[in-house]
Amino acid sequence: MECPKCQGNMEEVTYGRNMTVDRCSNCKGIWFDVGEAEVLKGKWMSEFVDSGDPEMGKEFNKIVDVDCPRCGKKMDKIADPKQSHIWYEACQEHGMYFDAGEFTDYKYETLLDKFRDLITGKRS
């Protein structure tokens, strides 16, 4: 599979015995098949799959038109409802893509995230 952001090679990374995600060997973005990100979010030490540089991830997050690596359709850019500063790409049929550093941020909702929501309010 090819990375939807930098067209690098996606390599399989295994968490535990039965969960495999795809991580780009170049930009370290991560592809999660449908449901995998939500499952891994609750697992101990699952952030190890997110080994990329968050600063590099911020640069790749600026890319707007991103195609699903499974079907080639344009993915939606979605803000996490609990942490509105996190934007990821999602294909309703196949999964979601996080830039380097985003999954770790997605996993850990901090006090600062809750404060941001109070200040900025919820998106409609």
Predicted regions and their residues:
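Short cysteine-rich clusters marking metal-coordination/redox-active sites
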Residues: C3-C6, C24-C27, C68-C71, C91
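Secreted/processed peptides and extracellular or luminal domains of membrane proteins
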Residues: N9-E12, I30-D33, K74-K77, Y97
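The feature marks the first
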Residues: M1-D22
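Non-ligating segments of multi-cofactor redox enzymes
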Residues: K5, N9, M96, E102, ...
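Short, solvent-exposed interaction modules
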Residues: S51-A100
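Short amphipathic alpha-helical linker/capping segments at the junctions of internal repeats
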Residues: W44-G57, Y108-R123
